[in-house]
């Protein structure tokens, strides 16, 4: 299975030890604060300062989440009403559209293409009727394509959001996978006026099943999200918070060793992609290889089905992420080297 981006590697031992020791605390099994432990929020604030040079107030500008995915729903409930419109990338994470529909708002897809480096076409966006658009989803580093984005792009996006009074949300869980220059939209001057950012410990620290993420932004936006969240759960489990605190303290050597594993796997996946006649961007970042199928292939899904039934290998068809994913397939790096080599061998 080369489809799902669920890290198969273990967290650092210090993370597991911190959780184990937390079980001995007398309040470990009680309800926890909706805002999380102050120590966790401070750890997240320090993480943003160290890696992105972004200053955040730990009391008002950051909110721990049970995974950043729940933040997508919280944000929709906090800021959207029936009939509002939301700009959603095509291709992009399917949950953006699903959540918009759940709150009876309207998804408006905007095109991302290889010709434009998988970045928004601002000229095309400005031609749209934006009067009902309340929110815009972006995701850089981009999933599924691995486009890194840039501070210059973020500046354009912040200017666009200010001009049209749109709340901009950057979904940013892939900053630290095979990416030498992690960036945050909150690095841009004035971004806090119009932007929120979601982040996650899932891919960064191999903790997908722990469900730890965060949303960052100005106090007014965070308070609106908290009003929703406080009616959805009763706080994050204490032991998980303690483990997350330990993870956030890890040195940069953690990312270096992780990248060594992923770089080796990626090189093997490049070989597999070449066997399938695909082309790809070797400079893409993140947890996936986004590969373009040969021009002779008319359907990504049909191509994948044939491989699934004949070789017993699953690869994600690009169409899962939108119509602009047609002609592409996505490999996950969350597959052991031996299994990738086995997959390569099945093609002779």
Model regions and ranges:
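A short helix->loop->beta-strand "cap" motif at the edges of active sites that frequently abuts
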Residues: 84, 105, 163-167, 191-193
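N-terminal small-domain helix-loop-helix segment of the aminotransferase-like
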Residues: 1-66, 74, 248-250
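Helix C-cap/helix->beta junction micro-motif
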Residues: 103, 163-164, 276, 311
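Active-site phosphate-binding strand-loop segment of PLP-dependent enzymes
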Residues: 108, 112-183
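Conserved glycine-rich beta-strand-loop-beta hairpin in the small C-terminal domain of fold type I
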Residues: 245, 261-270, 280-292, 325
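Conserved core segment of the aminotransferase class I/II
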Residues: 190-263, 267-271
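PLP-dependent enzyme catalytic core of the Aspartate aminotransferase-like
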Residues: 46, 54, 126, 297, ...
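Conserved PLP-anchoring active-site segment centered on the Schiff-base-forming lysine
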Residues: 78-100
């Amino acid at each position: 299975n080369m489809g799902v981006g669920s890290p198969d590697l273990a967290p650092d031992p210090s993370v597991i030890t911190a959780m184990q020791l937390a079980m001995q605390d007398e309040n470990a099994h009680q309800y926890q604060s909706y805002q999380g432990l102050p120590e966790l929020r401070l750890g997240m604030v320090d993480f943003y300062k160290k890696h992105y040079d972004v200053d955040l107030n730990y009391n008002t500008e950051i909110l721990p989440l049970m995974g950043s995915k729940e933040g997508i729903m919280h944000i929709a409930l906090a800021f959207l009403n029936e009939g509002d419109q939301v700009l959603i990338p095509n291709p992009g994470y399917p949950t953006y559209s699903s959540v918009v529909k759940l709150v009876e708002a309207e998804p408006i897809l905007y095109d991302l293409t290889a010709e434009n480096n998988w970045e928004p076409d601002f000229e095309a966006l400005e031609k749209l009727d934006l009067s009902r658009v309340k929110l815009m989803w972006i995701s850089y580093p981009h999933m599924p394509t691995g486009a890194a984005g840039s501070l210059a792009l973020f500046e354009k996006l912040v200017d666009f959001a200010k001009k049209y009074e749109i709340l901009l949300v950057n979904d940013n869980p892939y900053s630290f996978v095979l990416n030498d220059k992690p960036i945050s939209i909150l690095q841009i001057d004035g971004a806090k006026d119009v932007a929120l950012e979601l982040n996650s410990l899932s891919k960064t620290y191999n903790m997908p099943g722990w469900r730890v993420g965060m949303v960052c932004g100005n106090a007014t936006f965070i308070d609106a999200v908290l009003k929703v969240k406080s009616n959805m759960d009763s706080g994050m489990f204490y032991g998980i918070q303690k483990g997350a605190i330990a993870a956030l303290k890890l040195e940069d050597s953690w990312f270096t060793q992780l990248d060594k594993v992923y770089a080796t796997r990626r090189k093997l996946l490049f070989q597999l992609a070449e066997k399938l006649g695909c082309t790809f961007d070797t400079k893409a970042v993140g947890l996936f290889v986004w590969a373009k199928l040969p021009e002779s292939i008319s359907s990504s899904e049909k191509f994948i089905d044939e491989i699934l039934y004949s070789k017993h290998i699953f690869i994600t068809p690009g169409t899962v992420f939108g119509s602009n994913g047609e002609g592409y397939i996505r490999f996950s790096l969350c597959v052991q080297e031996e299994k990738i080599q086995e997959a390569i061998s099945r093609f002779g």
